[in-house]
Amino acid sequence: MLNGENVDSRIMGKVATRASSKGVKSTLGTRGALENISNVARNNLQAGAKKELVKAKRGMTKSKATSSLQSVMGLNVEPMEKAKPQSPEPMDMSEINSALEAFSQNLLEGVEDIDKNDFDNPQLCSEFVNDIYQYMRKLEREFKVRTDYMTIQEITERMRSILIDWLVQVHLRFHLLQETLFLTIQILDRYLEVQPVSKNKLQLVGVTSMLIAAKYEEMYPPEIGDFVYITDNAYTKAQIRSMECNILRRLDFSLGKPLCIHFLRRNSKAGGVDGQKHTMAKYLMELTLPEYAFVPYDPSEIAAAALCLSSKILEPDMEWGTTLVHYSAYSEDHLMPIVQKMALVLKNAPTAKFQAVRKKYSSAKFMNVSTISALTSSTVMDLADQMC
């Protein structure tokens, strides 16, 4: 093994010899930590050596596919002709502008553009909102529930009404979103359409439908244990989980059917209605939930009919004008049979056995709309009598 001192002396001797051969004065010495690590003093170059370092400047270029530089002197490069940039031909915008103008006039002829002030708010999607609602109308037709699904069931229409009246109370107890309630009933009806359910399992299907809807709509949905408690331990957590899997499989995991409340918001904006009319329309829509007779109608039809009846109750002179016809996609003549059915349900509400919805909308939170005197007006009675 070599001695450390001998190795150091040999290395230092070689450095000194190389420095002297290049005309550099060796100045080896001690240095502090993290200081100059060179053993050669760079400022002691002789004047002659400095002159020798001055060389002719060479043309430089970037090498292909790298950022390093290479000399191009001595290379035989054929000069290339510069390609003259071709300016694009000017686009004739007259036809496009005329087409857009014609489309706009056709869309808005006699119809107020209710989205013209929403372009600065990206959340309102004003550029695509009409396409979105058109797609939603397509979806509601795809998810349409059969009108005769009770024929395959052991349960009856009355049992369905009892269940939904109880679900309205559960929904209110848990302080859930409006969308969650409507989605719960949609899931319930779609499942009953394809799967026979026994009487003792109907409540299980109901609470599980609400659990699924809450997971879909809510930021903080209730836990399974909450639904076990609300059923007074009639079902276990395992039973609810099993039913959840069963419902999702039978519905092919498709839960995106549009809801009445989605269309009502659009219609209320088109009609420029106030909070009371909008809340009254929500009350009318919820009154239809326990009624099996309203299952055949699309959510967009129920929403439009609810707003139409609400307007007739609170503002009899208000017309279902061109703007409302355009954005709701329904004329008043089309809605009138549904409006008359709603009026009959509204007329019978004070004496009906199921009072959950009426009690809910009697609170100040919902403007006490279920208790106002206008609900017993001649307008409501005349519309209801046409169904008798």
UniProtKB/Swiss-Prot annotation:
Keywords: Cell cycle, Cell division, Cyclin, Mitosis. GO terms for biological process: cell division; mitotic cell cycle phase transition. It comes from the Eukaryota. Coiled coil: none annotated. One of its GO terms (molecular function) is cyclin-dependent protein serine/threonine kinase regulator activity. Pfam families: Cyclin_C, Cyclin_N. InterPro entries: Cyclin, Cyclin-like_dom, Cyclin-like_sf, Cyclin_A/B-like, Cyclin_C-dom, Cyclin_N, Cyclins_cyclin-box. Signal peptide: none annotated. PROSITE patterns: CYCLINS (PS00292). Interacts with the CDK1 protein kinase to form a serine/threonine kinase holoenzyme complex also known as maturation promoting factor (MPF). The cyclin subunit imparts substrate specificity to the complex. Essential for the control of the cell cycle at the G2/M (mitosis) transition. Belongs to the cyclin family. Cyclin AB subfamily. This is G2/mitotic-specific cyclin-B. It comes from Marthasterias glacialis (Spiny starfish).
